A protein has these predicted regions:
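Conserved FAD/dinucleotide-binding core of flavoprotein oxidoreductases
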Residues: 209-261, 281-295, 306-309, 313
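Residue-level marker for buried hydrophobic side chains located in beta-strands
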Residues: 275-277
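Alpha-helix-centered segments that form part of catalytic cores
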Residues: 65-103
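Predominantly flavin-linked oxidoreductase catalytic cores and closely associated redox partners
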Residues: 91-245, 300
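Single, function-defining residue in the core of a domain
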Residues: 244, 267-272
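C-terminal helical "tail/cap" subdomain of flavin- and related membrane-associated enzymes
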Residues: 305-325
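Dinucleotide-binding Rossmann-like beta1-alpha1 core, especially the glycine-rich loop
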Residues: 2-81
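Extended charged low-complexity segments that act as oligomerization/scaffolding linkers
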Residues: 8, 12, 28, 196-198, ...
Length: 325
């Protein structure tokens, strides 16, 4: 995300103000081993190592009194202290550590729309009702509910799991991976700080194991976002809702919840004919490591680097699909 902000030319401080953003420098995994409150960190930065990294070997040969994560990175300690990954202004103690951001995705979408339209992009808020095709199998135009006919040489399918272009019209197969990744639902909840939370914004994401999945806790500036990721084959929606309320505490009984349905897998071809899948229309891996953001970022960068400048996109589509599909 920091790379994308730099490419677009967005000031990180302005970004954080606009999208309710906070720092994210690690993921803290709680109750994944014994369920007794134990935890470990996946930090984003690590100590400089020699050409051969022997950190794991040294830790196994030690008395293991220090958690493994703390022997490879300073960030677990910084996270426990609730500190930012950026040194105080004017500090002489080095460069910032690696970090990302927590953000309100809807506010970020509004911000990107504002920037894009200011740079000449035309934005239509509409619904696609039909797709016209060329004889060669390429998409000719999309027709909208308001009566518009939008023609283009290249179409980007950002319609989520619906994949209105790639799946509904081009009939590109979806490669299902649910036999390996079982989770397919998330019960979501927002907890306002002012009423139900002490206002302590942690500089990391928390992933806590529950009976049939895990809960994300994402701290924003004004609220905490929770989501119980689980498999509908092993727990009902009502039971999952009760479990996330119990996890959060008595105040959660009065809070609204939502349900997100998702499928794990990828499109057999992320680039088919003159249609490129970006985001959920092309792939999704369960949200444990925020891979959805990474894959969307990668697809955008790949498309920019392999943008076709003539009618024959065979070579660039082949390379795009080797990476993305």
């Amino acid at each position: 995300i920091r790379h994308i902000l730099a490419v677009i030319g967005i000031d990180p401080l302005d970004f954080m103000k606009r999208v309710d953003g906070t720092f994210k420098q690690a993921i803290k995994y709680v109750n994944w081993l014994e369920g007794n409150g134990e935890y470990f960190y996946h930090a984003f930065d690590k100590f400089q190592v020699q050409p051969i990294d022997r950190a794991a070997l040294r830790w196994h040969m030690s008395d293991r009194s220090v958690p493994f994560g703390e022997t490879t990175s300073i960030q677990p300690v910084i996270c426990e202290l609730g500190r930012t990954p950026i040194p105080q202004r004017g500090s002489q103690f080095g460069e910032p550590l690696k970090f990302a951001f927590h953000m309100n995705a809807l506010k970020f979408a509004d911000m990107l729309c504002e920037i894009a339209t200011a740079r000449g992009v035309k934005h239509y808020l509409d619904h696609v009702t039909e797709v016209d095709m060329h004889d060669n199998g390429n998409i000719a135009a999309v027709l909208t509910k308001s009566g518009k006919r939008l023609e283009a040489d290249l179409f980007v399918d950002c319609t989520g799991f619906a994949a209105l272009l790639a799946e509904k019209k081009l009939e590109v197969d979806w490669v299902d991976c649910s036999q390996w990744l079982l989770c397919d639902r998330a019960i979501t909840m927002n907890v306002p700080y002012e009423h139900h939370y002490p206002g302590y914004v942690r500089p990391y994401t928390t992933a806590s194991a529950l009976s049939n999945g895990w809960v994300w806790e994402i701290p924003l500036q004004t609220r905490k976002a929770l989501g119980y990721v689980h498999s509908s084959a092993y727990i009902s929606e009502d039971d999952a809702r009760r479990e996330i309320r119990a996890f959060e505490g008595p105040h959660a009984e009065s809070l609204d919840t939502g349900t997100v349905h998702f499928k794990v897998g990828h499109r057999a071809k992320a680039w088919a004919h003159n249609c490129v899948c970006v985001g959920l229309s092309g792939n999704f891996i369960e949200p444990l490591e925020s891979t959805g953001l990474y894959l969307s970022d990668l697809a955008i960068v790949m498309l920019a680097d392999h943008f076709p400048f003539d009618d024959d996109s065979t070579a660039v589509a082949y390379r795009f699909n080797r990476v993305m599909a």
